[in-house]
Amino acid sequence: LGRLGVNVTFISETGNDKVGDIILKFMRENGVSTDHVNVFPEGKSPVSLAFLNEQNDAEYLFYKDYPRLRLDVTMPEIHRDDIVMIGSYYAVTPQLRDKVKELLDKAREKGAIIYYDVNFRSTHKNEAIKLLPVILENFEYADIIRGSVEDFENMFGLTDADKVYKSKIEFYCPHFICTHGGKGIRLYTKNIKKHYEADPLQTVSTVGAGDNFNAGVVFGLLKYRIRRDDLDELSEDDLA
């Protein structure tokens, strides 16, 4: 998004170390503001390693050494129809809940579009029941929920997108995108229920695939000037 000239701000944290320096430098060089990234003096920048299997899908290992005080940042200004994206374990971890809720409350108050990419890894599958109240609270805040079949299998033990939508999503948020790798995408809104095929391709790596998908959705919302109040009225003609 930054490379496409979109005004992007990243809210996160990193350590005061070489890994953190690389992360911040990369974001700045690619048009992403780091004004709201907390550089903590204690602890180390978290590192994740991706290992590709035979299908070039990634399995991850995470290394973390966080300080006691987390995400000590001032939240950015938010305006109506801005797009605020949250996701992954960062959006549900108890240590950051107060700060995440501060952001979500501000986004809701200002009338921004809240986009929630659940991205619930298998490494946290054993915490799914404990984290369920926070996950559902995020669903309630969200205007758009995006997740993969694997995410919902890890969270709910469900792999059927229709069942996920009807039993877990629709009550909280009517706008849902479920991705299933090469098997395509299912889109649900108040007026649309549709499956979109994925073009076949030779995958080199799936690292960052979900992030790129999210960026594409956000860019589409911006390009076609879709506002928060427009979401309930979207039809297939709008998506053609």
Segments (PLM) and residue ranges:
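Structural motif
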Residues: D82-I83, I144, H175
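A short, aliphatic-rich alpha-helical micro-motif
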Residues: E77-H79, N138-F139, E170
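Conserved N-terminal subdomain of the carbohydrate kinase-like
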Residues: N7, I11-S88
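Conserved phosphate-binding/catalytic region of the ribokinase-like
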Residues: D105, T159-A240
